[in-house]
Amino acid sequence: ALGAQSRTLVVCNPPYGRDGSALTSHSETTRIARHEGGLSPEELARAAARLLRSGGRFCVVYPAPRIYEMMRAMDDCRLAPKRIRTVHGVAGRAPKLVLLDAVKDGGSQLHWLEPLVLRDADGEYTDEWRRIYRMGAERRNG
């Protein structure tokens, strides 16, 4: 078991679909992977805050339309967002996801980072996305 205040970093890419509001799957495994079930933003923030030492970081990926819910839950658990970066599937379109980096007991200053754009207006992957993807593949392949 993971002890309280035993970690300096918690990273999470949780399922974000609200039960009953997104397309459901016939596969139990797929449903669990895509829908939050019993893992609300409040429960996720509480779990991260319990695990983190003061000054520890909580990094999470969350859907842009629901980011207020996550930020409110973080605030309730003394997790202060420090860096925020929007993720855009295509240049010029609204973000689909938000990358949040919060610090337990971290104060109130928030830094907005440049958006991460996956594809340009012509549908081609951006240079930054290619670098990120290549770096991940290199780490996996040793």
Please provide the spans of the model-predicted regions.
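Short loop/turn elements that flank and shape the SAM/SAH-binding pocket of Class I
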Residues: 1-2
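Mobile active-site "lid"/loop adjacent to the S-adenosyl-L-methionine
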Residues: 5-9, 14-43, 47
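Solvent-exposed, flexible loop/coil residues
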Residues: 6, 20, 36, 43, ...
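Short, flexible active-site-adjacent loop segments at beta-strand->alpha-helix junctions, enriched
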Residues: 13-16, 64, 106
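Residue-level preference for alpha-helix termini and adjacent loops
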Residues: 15, 22, 31, 86-89, ...
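Conserved Class I SAM-dependent methyltransferase catalytic core
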Residues: 37-95, 99
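SAM/dcSAM-binding transferase cores
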Residues: 94-142
